[in-house]
Amino acid sequence: MLDIKKIKEILPHRYPFLLVDRVISVEDGKKVTAIKNVTANEEFFNGHFPEYPVMPGVLIVEALAQTSGIAMMQNEANKGKIGLFAGIDGCRFKRQVVPGDQLLLEAEITRMRGAIAKAKVKATVEGDLVCEAEIMFALSDLPK
């Protein structure tokens, strides 16, 4: 399990764009399960939508990408690198995410070849599928 302090040691993202609250499991150094607690105080609810707050789908995808980043950084060869979003395939949204929901984020690295990685990702709330996709990343060195 990784708390927010450990997550910040792995990911360069910070408020308001750090969208992973806790990592609850890491398997085989390539599969990560994490959570994002969605509260009524999220900045994006001010405009999306004031009378009908729904978490934007692109932010659900970003939370999944960040979870994938944590998975990629479990590989020693990737330490000091960042996974840049390079593409997405088969993305489907099945359920809205609203204040009070807890997103369960799952990412499994399915391919790692050179500087390119792919991850199969899935988000659920209380067992209901929210989103699934395959995300591609280009690994790059972090600036010093």
Curated annotation (Swiss-Prot):
Domain of life per record: Bacteria
Active site positions: 48
GO cellular component assignments: cytoplasm; membrane
GO biological process entries: fatty acid biosynthetic process; lipid A biosynthetic process
Assigned keywords, A-Z: Cytoplasm, Lipid A biosynthesis, Lipid biosynthesis, Lipid metabolism, Lyase
Family to which the UniProt record says this protein belongs: Belongs to the thioester dehydratase family. FabZ subfamily.
Full protein name: 3-hydroxyacyl-[acyl-carrier-protein] dehydratase FabZ
Species in which this protein is naturally found: Listeria monocytogenes serotype 4a (strain HCC23)
